[in-house]
Amino acid sequence: MSSTQQLPFGGGVEFADNPEPRCPCLLLLDTSGSMRGQPLNELNAGIRVFRDELSADLMASKRVEVAIVGFGPVQVLSEFQTVDTFNPPTLAATGDTPMGAAVEEGLALLDQRKQAYRANGIAFYRPWIFLITDGGPTDAWMNAAAKVKSGEAAKHFSFFAVGVEGARMDILRQFGTREPLKLKELRFRDLFVWLSNSLGSVSKSKVDETVDLVNPATPQGWASV
C-alpha cells in the first residue's frame, strides 16, 4: 500500500458512529505527465476547495463520501470516506494515461463500498463518478467503456467525463450516456464548487428522489460541450 493512501475506519465502526445514508463520489483523475505544472496545480487546489465546501455543509459532511483513483500509474489515492477524515492527497504528474484500467479499478472500488453499505444496513444514493483527463487513454479502454455504459443503463451510478484542453473528446463520448464536458481554461475550482453544491443538494434529498442540477455548460459556467 502506498504511503499516500488513506483508509477509513474499518469493522463497521464508521457506520455505527454515523448511520446516515451515504452519497459516494468517485474521482478518477489523470495524473499523467502532460498534466504537469499549472493544470495539476489547479486540480490540486480544486480538490481542496471541494473538501472545504463539503465540510461547510452539515448534511453533506455526514453523507457524501469521496474516493480518488489516480492514473498513471493507476493507484487508489484515497478510499471512500466522509469529509471529516478526507485529507486530499497532493497529486503528482508521472507516467502515461491508463484510463481504461483506472475506470475498472474505480468500478471495483465502488462495488466493494456498496457491499459494505449493504452489509451494515446503510442506505445509499446513486453514486457519482467523475473522470477528468487531458488526453487519450494509452491502454485498452473499450471494455471499461462498455462497463460504464451498462452500469449507467442499470442506474448503478451516474458517470460524468470532463476533458481538459487536449483531451480526446471522441473517446470520452464512448463512456457513459452523457455528452462529455470540456473544461473552460483551467477552472477546476469552479468545477469542484459546482460538484460540492450538486452533491449537497443530493444529500438533502430522499435516496430515490431526482434532483435538478445547475447546468455547468452555460456561458457563465465552467464547462462547454
Predicted feature residues:
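Solvent-exposed loop/turn segments at secondary-structure junctions
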Residues: T31, P73-V76, G135-T138, E165-R168
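Mixed-charge (Asp/Glu-Lys/Arg
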Residues: S32, F50, P137, W141-S150
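DG-centered beta-turn motif at the end of beta-strands
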Residues: L29-S32, L43, I68, G106, ...
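P/S/T/G-enriched low-complexity
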Residues: G10-P19, S61, I122, K147-F157, ...
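Short beta-strand-loop
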Residues: K62-T90, M169-F175
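Acidic, polar low-complexity linker/tail segments
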Residues: M1-L26, T31-N41, S55, K114-A119
